[in-house]
Amino acid sequence: MKFINTLFLALLISSISNNTNAEETYIGDVSMGEVKHSAAFTQMKRMLGEWEGKLYQQSGAVVDTYSKFRLVSNGNSIVETLIEDGVEMFTTYSDKDGKLVIKHYCALGTEPMFTVASMDKNSIQLKSDPRPGYHPEHHNFVKSMGWTFKDENDVRVDATLHLDGELQAQHSMIKRIN
């Protein structure tokens, strides 16, 4: 009898647990369904929240930087608001056909796209997607971006930019504030 009671209790707890995780999102009577995310999207979710720190430019200039990463669209997209030295920019992160797709709306007036170049448990590196058609001799644009996680609250952000035909590197050291 003790075995049957234990088994019943285990099944009851299991069914309650499964029902709690089985919530679906609806808009009106339309189910939004379930989407599986790439490992790269899951890695970027580590950035959710607010961050601030310093941006170190190749020229030697050091400016304030702030980022806010939010999960939107039923958890299927991440939007980043980035403010460098008071100038606001916007970046989106979402999956398409199982791969992370990134689009950056840059203060340079360009909208470069990125794909994953490499990833491990402590970093994700992005490279320029050639589809927007930017050329280093004719356009100013971000060529690469990457995040290296010291821990969940301290991150180094690296980027390279084509500026007036020259490739420049910069990095930020940011801390989670929320």
Q: Each PLM stretch: what is its role?
A:
Residues 140-144:
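Asp-box/WD-like beta-propeller blade repeats and closely related beta-sheet repeat scaffolds
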Residues 7-15:
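Bacterial N-terminal signal peptides
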